[in-house]
Amino acid sequence: MVIPKEILSDFKELYEKANRLVEEESRNDPPTDPFRSHYKARDVLIVLKKQLDDQLVSVQASEEDGGQDDRCYHSLLAFVCRDLGRIYIYTEEQAEGEKMLNRCLELVTPFKECPEGIIPFIGAINELSIVLASKEEYNKGLEILLEAEKIYEDFKASGLKPLAIQDVFNPPEEGQQSHEAGPKELESLYTLVSFYMAQMYGHLGEPEKSAKCCHRTLHRQLESKTYDPIDFALNTATLSQFYIGEKRFEEARHHLAAATLIMAEYEVHMLEPEMSEKQRQDVSETFKHRYADVARCWAKYGLYLMNTSKLRLMRDEDDEDAKNLEIVLRNMRLVEAEQSRFPGLDLTACENRISCEYCLTFDDAKLVFHFVNEWLDIAKDYYKAENEATEYSKIMQDYAEAYEHIAFFEENPENQAKMQKRRAKYLEDLLDLLDPIFYMKICRECWYGAGTAHAAVMDVRLDIIRATSTPAPEDIKKVNQSCMKAIKHFESYVKSYLVKPPSEEWRPNMDVEEQRHMLYAHFHIGRIYYKLISGHPLQQLEHLTSCHTYYQRFDAGCQLHKEAAETLQGEIGVVREMLQLLPLKINTIKARLNKAGLTA
C-alpha cells in the first residue's frame, strides 16, 4: 500500500473524530436529543466518504500501481460505509443503514478473504443480520451469517493476518511486526456471528443449533475475557434452561455452575473505591437482582430433575423400548456434554453440590429437595410480594412444586399427607394475597394445584381408613375436610372459566390445554363428591347427586371438546360406567328415604 502518509493521516483524523463522538461523547447526550453525537459522527463520516470516493476515482483513472492503492481505498471506504450503516440503524434510519451496509459488501466482496477485506465484510454482515431479524427475515439472516462463518474459517486456515482500520491507517514500517488490532477484532466479530446465528436458529425453531451457537459464543467470550460478568451469568443460566428441557442435566448443571462462579468472582471486586454511594447501591442492587435470577434457574434445575425422576419411575418397568432409547440417548449425550463445557473454569466444587443423575430413592430426592429450597430462599430474599407480586408468586409456586415432588418419593403415608398439605398451604397463602381480577392466571394455577394437593391428602386418609376395620370418627372427619377443601378450590377454578355463573357455559377462546384442565377439574369434583363419607342418607344422596352432575358435565364437555379429551380416555371410561351406576345408587337411597318417611 503506497497511499501517502499525509493523506492517510487526514483520513485517520476524521475517522477517529467520528469514533470519539460515538464511543465517548454520545454518553453525555441529553434525553431530549439522544442521537446528537451520532448525527455529528455521521456528518464527519459522510465528509470522509466523499474524500475517499474522490480519491478512488482518481486512483482508478491512473492505475499506476497495479491496483494496490485501489484495494486500500476500497477497504477504507468499506469500513466507513459499515460504520455509517451502523449509525443510520442506531438513529432509526434503517433503509439508509441497509443501503450503506450493502455498499460496504459490494466494495469488499472481490477481496473478502484478504486481510484488507475480511473485517469490514463480516462486520457489515453482522449489522445486516440485525436489520433482517427486525424484518423477520430469519432465513435470509441465517444465510448471510453462515457465509460469514465459512469466510472466517477459510481465512483462519490461510494463516493470513486480518487488518483492522487502525492497521490500514498505520501500516508497519519495513521489517516491523504487523499490528495486532486486526486479529482481535476479527475474533470479536466471529463471536458476534455465533451470537446472531443463535438468535436466527431460535426464531427458526431449531433450538439445538441455537444452543450450540449460544454455548460457542459464551465459550469464546470467556477465552477472550470480553464479557460482562452479569450478562455472561444470565446468558449461561438461561442456556441451562434449554438443557434442562432436554433432560441433559449434566450440561445444565455445568452452565449453572459457570454462572454461579462468574457471579461469585465478580462480587469480590464489583465495588470500587472511587464509586459514589449511589453507584455502590446501584451495583449491589443489580447483583442481588441477577443472583436471584440465577438462583431461580438452579431451583428449576432441581424441580425438573425431581419431576423427570418421578415420571421415569412411574413408567412401565417392562417398557424395554423406552429403556433402550434411554441408553442410546445417554451414550449420545456423553459426547454432547463434552462439547458443551467451559474447559477454562474449575467448576468441580460447585457441580458437586448437586447430582445430575436421576433420583431413585427418597434419600436421593431429599438432597435435591433441600438444594431447591436453599436457592428459592435466596430468590425470595430479593423478590418481595409488595413490589414484585408476580415473581414472588412464581417462587411460592416453586416451593409448592418441590413438596409435590418429594411427596412422591416419601413412603410413609402420614408424611406424604403432611407434604401435600404444605404444598397446599403455599398455594392458599398466595390466594389470600392475590386479587384474581389482576392475577387470574396465577390464581387459576393455585386453585387447581391446591385442589389436587387436598385430593392427594384425601386419598392417603382413605387408604388409612381402609386399612382399619373400625375407623375413628376423627379419621373420617379428616377425610371429609380434605374433600371439601379440594372441592372448594376446584369449583373456584371452574367458575373462573364460566361466562356468567351460575350458567355452565364456558368462556369462548379457551385453548386446548385450558379445556383439558377444565375437564379434569370436573372429573376431580365428581370423584371427590363420591368419596365423601356420611352415615346419613340425605347427605349421601346430596353427594351422589353432585357427583352425577359433575360427571355429566365432564362427559358433555368431552363430547364438545374432542381434541382436549383425546388424552382422557381412561377417565371417560370410568365416568361413563359411573353414569350408569349412579342413578341406581341414587334411586336405592331415595327408596330407603321414602321407606323411612324422609323426603329426598
UniProtKB/Swiss-Prot annotation:
Protein localization: Cytoplasm, Cytoskeleton
Coiled-coil residue windows: 384-434
Gene Ontology cellular component terms for the protein in this record: cytoskeleton; mitochondrion
Stretch forming the signal peptide: none
Main location: cytoplasm
Keywords in alphabetical order: Coiled coil, Cytoplasm, Cytoskeleton
Superkingdom as given in the UniProt entry: Eukaryota
Gene Ontology biological process terms in this record: central nervous system projection neuron axonogenesis; microtubule cytoskeleton organization; mitochondrion transport along microtubule; neuron projection maintenance
Entry keyword annotation includes Coiled coil: yes
Similarity-based family: Belongs to the KIF-binding protein family.
Identification of the protein by name: KIF-binding protein
Organism for this UniProt entry: Drosophila melanogaster
